[in-house]
Amino acid sequence: MVAHPDDETLWAGGFVLEHSEWDWFIGTLCRASDLDRAPKFARVLECLHACGGMLDMDDGPEQRPLPALDVQRQVLRLLPGSHFDRLLTHGPQGEYTWHRRHREVCQAVVALWRAGRISADALWLFAYEDGERQYLPRAVRNAHVKHSLPPEVWRTKFDLMTQVYGFHPESWEARTTPRTEAFWCFESRGQLDKWWRERGLAV
């Protein structure tokens, strides 16, 4: 569950590609009416052998805060079922400095999973940081899971970003495309709450 079409590829595309036999659903909360990005997202879903859906929450440049309950309602509206083996979404600080929608989607998914309104055996949060804009986003050093992508998998992911989504090879998005993917991983609410508190985040 991501904020924007391309987030799924940028932050977890290698993982999806390496588990293409899984029954993937990819949802994005923004850009359903974007005549450029929406059809590209549909093509990426085909390349990833995934199902998916889009909604059209506000994503204007002002990045006005969205009511937390509204974001949660949209997440539930988009999800196709009641139970999932693994749920992937943004990290609590986003993946770079900084995008409000990434944080809001994380907060919504975490709140729903913690409350039992989304059932999933495991919750994985993207684990990337950019040193407060000191460098391109990269895997957090002590993330629970870090996986260096085989060259051919990374190339496929890079091609999705540049040839399907259409980002220039020298764009921020293309240069960011991680060769190592990383996640914070939780199998219980207790694990998540402990980790959340240790980082000074509001539970």
List where the protein language model places each region.
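The feature marks non-catalytic terminal segments
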Residues: 86, 119-203
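Short catalytic/ligand-binding loop motif for oxyanion handling, primarily in non-cytosolic enzymes
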Residues: 61-63, 95-99, 106, 132-135
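Divalent metal-coordination and catalytic microenvironments
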Residues: 6, 41, 87, 101, ...
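Active-site environment of divalent metal-dependent phosphoester hydrolases
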Residues: 7-10, 33-36, 92-98, 131-133
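Active-site rim/loop-helix segments in enzyme catalytic domains that contact anionic ligands
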Residues: 1-83, 110-120
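Short aromatic-enriched loop/helix-cap "lid" or pocket-rim segments at secondary-structure transitions
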Residues: 12-13, 37-39, 100-101, 134-140
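Internal, well-ordered alpha-helical segments in soluble enzyme and binding-protein domains
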Residues: 37, 71, 104-109, 153, ...
